[in-house]
UniProtKB/Swiss-Prot annotation:
GO MF annotation terms: acid-thiol ligase activity
Pfam families noted in UniProt: AMP-binding, AMP-binding_C
Name recorded for this polypeptide: Pyochelin synthase PchD
InterPro entries found in the cross-reference section: AMP-bd_C (IPR025110), AMP-bd_C_sf (IPR045851), AMP-binding_CS (IPR020845), AMP-dep_synth/lig_dom (IPR000873), ATP-dep_AMP-bd_enzyme (IPR050237)
Amino acid sequence: MTSSPVTPSAVDDAPDWPAAFVRRYLDAGHWQDQSFAEALATSAARHPRRIALCDDDQRLSYADLLQRCRRLAAGLRQAGLAHGDTVVLHLPNGIAFVETCFALFQLGVRPVLALPAHRQHEISGFCRFAEAKAYIGAERIDGFDPRPMARELLASGACRMALIHGEAEAPLQALAPLYQADALEDCAARAEDIACFQLSGGTTGTPKLIPRRHREYLYNVRASAEVCGFDEHTVYLTGLPMAHNFTLCCPGVIGTLLASGRVVVSQRADPEHCFALIARERVTHTALVPPLAMLWLDAQESRRADLSSLRLLQVGGSRLGSSAAQRVEPVLGCQLQQVLGMAEGLICYTRLDDPPERVLHTQGRPLSPDDEVRVVDAEGREVGPGEVGELTVRGPYTIRGYYRLPEHNAKAFSADGFYRTGDRVSRDKDGYLVVEGRDKDQINRGGEKIAAEEVENLLIAHPQVHDATVVAMPDSLLGERTCAFVIPRQPAPSALKLKQYLHACGLAAFKVPDRIELVPAFPQTGIGKISKKDLRERLRRELEARA
């Protein structure tokens, strides 16, 4: 099997790197002729009896994990899935998530990595946009039973198959019998194939699927594992959703497995639960978003749990304040690593040997020597060190375009392939970045990205809503919360009724506005557009007055 420099976008609807860049990254050794399934097989051959995964009920060796993945791959193939198919994968943290991912990787079936918090509004949208052949779910996801939703997906034609980890009745299919198939040895996936689709928070209601290919995503994982010091002694705790790019591949679950370490699976990230797991399993590494990091800090100051095994806490998803950053080492007893990353590609890490001022006050520098970063002004001109501009990037693991969105890609990517992130950053003379905010109409609620337009469109569809606009409001714990300003029709609905309506629409709970205000009109700009800037300023002043 040989990686080809030929762009496959004509057959998979996703822009690939131009041939010259493919050759550059192959020659540099960044990209290898290997799929994720083959990489796992390499780890299993190296340490077959070592424990790869554990949760409260189960411990799997590398050999057992590989065998179960291969059996499931064979069963899924018998069920009708084949190379090039797309499925929506909607599972909670668990060993089943890892097994299903690698089984799909082996078949060359591309999972859309939905989050546990997603509900019918999002899942149906993913299925239809990606023309998914199947939905793969569980009998229970964070207290939610997705099986009625899965039946509706089938009835509406959003997908053709619905496969469930757990109990299932027709027309749903249980996945357990598929593990009885004879293990599939061959790997259908090629290094240049799309391995999976990550999800972009975006700024609109249209799903934006991020095509991550085996060769570049594996480089992302391996280079991250090297920078973060992951090895066979690493014990990695999954508190954040495993489908997240951060938890999955930065270096995350897959980085741990490829380094022959052990993954401790948790469906919860609260301090009480995780502290007990850290003590019991001697966890060495984990990753959090800033709000959870602050909860851990507060809990440990009052509890003094045994966290003596913990060596590294990664914090990313949004900016961690320097005051909280300064507390990590004295309170948790471990090193802090700040992370700035995006599912589209670029990852920046503070390095393990960085001086404290770098770790406390920056979000790190790019992972790869071939990451090309430009910080530009509104006219696209590069700004100087310390000046704020938009972060743009291209490199060996940053995508060249979203799946099936050519018009959006023309705006989101420059003609020479730089991704316009929408992040406002400053950069020092050594290439370290500091996040200053966002250009795009997107809200970052504790690391979860919310497209304002998606929520606005649902609100405007309510018969008692004339118009709606959604903005971020500052929050000391989450960084940002959401506030919806609504111009009602009479009789005016209550804020509670509107929240209930959004839940009934199947909107993920984290996207439902924290606050809804009914107003007679919106402030306007000089050209008659809604002035979200004025609304954000109004909220800021109000919150400051209350403080």
